[in-house]
Amino acid sequence: IEQRLQRLLRQNPLRTDFQQHYETIVAEYNREKDRVTIEKTFEELFRFELQLDDETRRAVREGLDEESLALFDLLRKPDLSPDEIRRIKAVAVALLQTVKARIEAIRDWESREATRDSILLTIRDFLWDETSGLPVDQYSEEEVHTRADEIFRHVYRVYPTLPSPYYAMEAVA
């Protein structure tokens, strides 16, 4: 369970609620070791593993791959209409393709400030674009900047090379 959880967290930083839930289960187990508590803990671990299975399948349910799902989660906000959610999914997929193409064109992109800035600007410009970017009536200027920064941090962390070593593990696990 712990290995699966760590893989999911490396792929998508917004899955920390699973980490917190797992830590709570383990802490409760360590607190008391009577038979009832142990049985309850194992039942809770089993339910938790089912939740991990569900989270693993969420990308498929959303019609995305794991890489696009991470960007979708970073872009999504509450109270979007179904049409806006579809648009955000399309933005996530297209943005990922754009960023990966840009990274591929720049050797050692993370080693120089100018190339890192270039990737950040690519992300910001894409999100601002009226045809391919975020719905302008749903995202303020500050929200676009915040999401662009969050996506850049995610890209910097998981794409030191292409293909990403974080998502390559998905095929192995």
Annotated model-derived regions:
Residues 1-173:
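Catalytic cores and motor modules of nucleic-acid processing enzymes
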